């Protein structure tokens, strides 16, 4: 094609069939859109390019033919397939512990081992003629009952003061009174349990073992 024809074709002065060069090919596609309008190079990226490399396409095809869901591998964050566990699990309590009585168990379950005491010796502590056989337990409600404690102790009777039901202020006053009373009459004043004290006259010798047994058996609670 000559230069003159090219100029004419450029300005639309030459027929299109005369415009023949390497840029036009009769075998090429027509000017109409034979492909979808929005199809471009991005359409060449098919879904398989983004598939998980760990998946087997053949397994997916077989699952599709059987009508079953494809077996996908677990997500990366849960690799290992740990089984789900209940967040809150009921606690199993020992039925023996639940059935064990909370109060008075020391009567049915005697102390064993090095702290155990011969039942005969335990009975001898409170049998007639033993100094502790006439022991008495007083449970004052307020400080006004201090007189009763003093009279019993002055008569030579061992006294157990159970101050559990008293408020701390009155209990402290009564403890101070009993300690002074025991000192004045040459007796002894010992703590047996929490807010429980034993006043022993001068002629009554209460050994540490006997005091421990009084506390362990709760003897003062049944008088």
From Swiss-Prot:
Q: Does the keyword RNA-binding apply?
A: no
How does this polypeptide assemble, per the annotation?
Homodimer. Interacts with FtsZ.
What the record says about family reads: Belongs to the SepF family.
- Region entry Disordered: which residue ranges? 19-81
Give compartment(s).
Cytoplasm
Pfam families given in the database record = SepF
GO annotation, biological process = division septum assembly; FtsZ-dependent cytokinesis
Protein name, UniProt field: Cell division protein SepF
Compositionally biased tracts (Basic and acidic residues) = 36-69
Q: Which UniProt keywords apply?
A: Cell cycle, Cell division, Cytoplasm, Septation
Highest taxon in the source lineage: Bacteria
Q: Name one GO cellular component term.
A: cytoplasm
Summarizing the function annotation, the protein's role is:
Cell division protein that is part of the divisome complex and is recruited early to the Z-ring. Probably stimulates Z-ring formation, perhaps through the cross-linking of FtsZ protofilaments. Its function overlaps with FtsA.
Per the UniProt entry, the disulfide pairs are none
């Amino acid at each position: 094609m000559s230069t003159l024809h090219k100029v004419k074709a450029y300005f639309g002065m030459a027929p299109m069939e005369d415009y023949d060069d390497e840029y036009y090919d009769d075998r090429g596609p027509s000017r109409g859109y034979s492909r979808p309008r929005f199809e471009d190079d991005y359409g060449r990226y098919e879904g398989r390019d983004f598939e998980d490399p760990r998946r087997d396409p053949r397994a997916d095809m077989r699952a599709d033919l059987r009508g079953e869901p494809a077996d996908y591998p677990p997500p990366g964050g849960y690799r290992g397939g740990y089984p789900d566990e209940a967040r809150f699990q009921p606690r199993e309590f020992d039925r023996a512990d639940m059935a064990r009585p909370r109060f008075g168990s020391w009567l049915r379950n005697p102390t064993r081992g090095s702290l155990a005491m011969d039942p005969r010796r335990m009975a001898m502590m409170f049998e007639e003629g033993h100094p502790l056989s006439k022991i008495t337990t007083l449970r004052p409600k307020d400080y006004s009952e201090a007189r009763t404690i003093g009279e019993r102790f002055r008569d030579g009777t061992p006294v157990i003061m159970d101050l559990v039901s008293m408020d701390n202020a009155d209990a402290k006053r009564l403890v101070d009174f009993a300690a002074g009373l025991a000192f004045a009459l040459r007796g002894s004043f010992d703590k047996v349990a929490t807010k429980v004290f034993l006043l022993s006259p001068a002629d009554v010798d209460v050994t540490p073992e006997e005091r421990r047994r009084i506390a362990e058996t709760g003897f003062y609670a049944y008088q």
